[in-house]
């Protein structure tokens, strides 16, 4: 009995020692491959402070971690950092470390990331960093892809604490996403799978033509998506969506084509109180929102159907909000706002964004008894 325990202890000790030593043996080889493949594929500057391999972090998978990774453009974008990440972690098959047939990547995790996407006034984006290969045929391109030592067979993709800025100077659109956390799981290596997605951003600001549509909005979503990866069509199944205090569901589908994105989506809200509508106003949502007293009825509907092509063509959309005989008051104030009646609608028949119409009729209220 004692002899068996001793042998087991020795075996475990040897195994742990190997798990500590082996990463050092493979680190130089994999670091060289990462830099070689990066230079082969990217027309950009990139580097990282260190590359580490661990057999513990995602056991029984091996983990490759790039610390302080950054990617910067060239030419006009050479001073603009596209991506800066504290850590980029890839989980690979452990046995692939001992062969030359490549490394199967089943999980990617990105932590503490800043992403700055820019579209110049002439339409050039700073994320167009892949080297062109205009001389290759489709068959040659497939062979080149197959020859890559890294095989993407993702089962899990994780984002932790990402800050993202999208600055479209041609389309006059701007988005600022703060503290985005997201998890996506599913068999991304198959033609069809069910993706399980959960994401939340602490603060989203969105402007179009200088007009703020969202300001520091808190957004959360959890959904199952029927993903037809062979045809790039994604159909929403069970899902929940929250925008500040408004909870809703989204029905429909999105299909990625080239260059269009086809869609048919509808926002479903079972019941929306006036207080939930007020959560869309940043100054109200940020100050004593829980103690705010409200009354009245409200409805919110939204739908979008058609094709979006770049910044020039938008799908048909219709967003409508109605408030009837509503009121709100802070407990600390002597008077509130009552007899609030609003009907607002934003519509576009599809096509140019300039065809968008905004109609607000009526918009009336009383403040401390005064209309």
Regions found by a protein language model. Name each.
Residues 41-49, 76-92, 105, 170-183, ...:
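Amphipathic hydrophobic-ligand
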Residues 68, 160-163, 202-204, 229-233, ...:
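Flexible, solvent-exposed coil segments and beta strand-coil junctions
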Residues 109, 116, 262-279, 295, ...:
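Outer-membrane beta-barrel translocator/pore domains, especially the C-terminal barrels
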Residues 164, 232-240, 357-363:
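Transmembrane beta-strand segments that form the barrel wall of outer-membrane beta-barrel proteins
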Residues 113, 133-233:
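Elongated, acidic membrane-bridging lipid-handling scaffolds
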Residues 52-124, 143-167, 185-200, 261-266, ...:
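Flexible beta-edge/linker motif
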Residues 1-45:
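N-terminal type II signal-anchor transmembrane helix
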